[in-house]
Regions:
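Membrane-embedded architecture of ER/inner-membrane glycosylation machinery
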Residues: 157, 269-493
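Membrane-integral, polyisoprenol-dependent glycosyltransferases
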Residues: 1-326, 461-488
Length: 493
């Protein structure tokens, strides 16, 4: 049953992957910018909606380009590599658990704990830098661990190369996170290893290889790039108001359904002095500690520590300690999520067939309580991908607006304006630049919020969401109440 669940999770990662429109605003940046990269052949300078976008290095765009090349410029192609790298990260975590414990069973439990955690799964279904960043950092740490434990010298340069790839996703943090984890671990366990010159030579090479894009942009864009780099990397260190415990509190939601089990697992590792889990413990503590000290706190920042959380949680579940307590936690998780699913189906008027799945975690609990949280995770995924998001998709009309614009101006010869609001996914679906914050000129196509532009009559109207789709729960609540929706017209001016 354990391996059946793992195969089912792998299947769920790709089912309905392309069924949902591009999420606005974040995913839209990568969807449109990569489409333009394939058109103009410039894979170094990302342009979103005709404007240079230097917020992140190009690796995420390149990954999307691979998906587009394989499956076409569509939602499935947009997200394919992210789903693949999400599973890849879980697979590497499985291999790491096997390396640490010698048990494939521990590996598969780690695979399930990571791949089914809510935040990690959600980001694996969504084109953004977080999953590629986590993948390359996890790969870097795994290759280093193999080098250190088995003495395979050729793996050390590969570990640093993986760190360079992480830098091409999100900049210097791609070096700081794996290097800091290894440094602290060796400082505590084997300080003499830190005296080896190879680490410092490879660090210089990794930084040169990983930061070439930033160097190129400094040389070619100068102050423009420095301004963006400061905002994206340095300003966040001191500009923010969240409390220092923000990430530990957020973990209760982001690592569901295993979050309730993780905190006792962490306590268990510390009390029992499980030396084989010293490495994931340092990994978790360093990343959570570092980002807790940074002023601006965003939940996905600590996602590179999630494989460590999965390793610690799976070890606790498979141990023979605290059996009654673990059974209690597993039952509570199953009960709470089952009640939440029941509430969601009734509250959002979803397909009642979802309710037929509610007994499954409890049936699995009777067979093996350790598998119940995985079944709970699968239940959450099914609820999201086959009930909640399809119901929400009915209220997302930006793709229809884009198709209508292409019908009005098939040759893309007219400028297109949006007045009264800007929908970030519209440039992708209209396949052209959308001019914003400007007075429309004659001979143009205008998308406008009704009563914000009175110089032409709409040929067709659409009801569109005006909030951020990235805040999914708020979007769901707004959709239910028809809140933050407005009527938009499209006209030939």
């Amino acid at each position: 049953m354990l391996y059946v669940l793992a195969l089912l999770v792998a299947l769920l990662y790709f089912l309905n992957l392309g069924a949902f429109q591009v999420w606005s605003p974040n995913e839209a940046f990568y969807a449109d910018s990569t489409r333009r990269m394939l058109q103009n052949g410039d894979f170094i300078n990302p342009y979103y909606n005709g404007e240079l976008r230097l917020n992140k290095p190009p690796m995420t765009y390149w990954l999307v380009a691979i998906g587009y090349s394989l499956f076409g410029v569509n939602e499935f192609g947009l997200r394919f590599m992210h789903a693949l790298l999400g599973l890849g990260t879980a697979f590497i975590t499985m291999l790491m658990a096997k390396e640490l414990t010698g048990s494939w069973k521990a590996g598969v439990y780690s695979f399930l704990a990571l791949s089914l955690s809510v935040q990690f799964f959600a980001n694996s279904q969504y084109a953004s830098p977080e999953v590629p960043f986590t993948f390359f950092i996890t790969l870097s740490l795994y290759l280093w661990l193999l080098y250190y434990k088995r003495g395979y010298l050729f793996l050390l340069p590969l570990a640093f190369f993986a760190s360079s790839l992480a830098m091409l996703v999100k900049g210097p943090a791609g070096f700081v996170l794996p290097a800091g984890t290894v440094f602290i671990y060796l400082l505590l366990k084997d300080p003499r290893e830190l005296l080896k010159l190879r680490y410092y030579i490879l660090s210089v090479l990794a930084l040169l290889l990983g930061l070439w894009w930033q160097a190129y942009q400094i040389f070619t864009k100068g102050g423009l790039f420095w301004e963006v780099f400061y905002k994206e990397n340095l300003r966040r260190v001191y500009h923010g108001s969240e409390p220092i415990y923000f990430y530990l509190a957020d973990l209760n939601v982001s690592f569901l359904p295993y979050s309730l089990i993780f905190f006792p697992a962490l306590l268990w590792v510390l009390i029992k002095l499980k030396r084989e889990y010293a490495f994931p413990l340092v990994w978790f503590a360093f990343i959570y500690g570092l980002f807790s000290l940074i002023a601006q706190k965003i939940p996905v920042y600590v996602m590179p520590a999630f494989p460590a959380l999965a390793l610690i949680t799976s070890a606790f579940l498979l141990s023979e300690d605290w059996e009654r307590f673990k059974k209690f936690l597993s039952f509570v998780v199953s009960l709470l999520v089952a009640l939440a699913v029941l509430f969601a189906v009734l509250f959002f008027s979803l397909n009642p067939l979802i309710l037929t799945l509610l007994p499954l975690p409890f049936l699995l609990f009777l067979r093996d309580y350790r598998l119940a949280p995985a079944m709970v995770g699968i239940l959450i995924v099914v609820l999201l991908k086959f009930a909640l998001l399809p119901s929400l998709e009915e209220k997302r009309k930006v793709r229809e607006v884009g198709e209508f614009i292409k019908m009005l101006d098939a040759k893309a010869s007219k400028p297109v304006y949006e007045v009264g609001h800007f929908h970030h996914s519209l440039p992708f679906y209209a396949e052209r630049r959308i001019i914003r914050d400007s007075q429309p000129e004659r001979g143009s196509v205008v998308v406008f919020r009704l009563n914000s532009f009175n110089d032409c009559e709409p040929v067709r109207t659409f009801r569109l969401y005006t909030g951020s789709e990235s805040r999914l729960f708020k979007f769901l609540m707004d959709a239910r109440k028809d809140k933050n929706f407005a009527d938009f017209g499209v006209c030939l001016y």
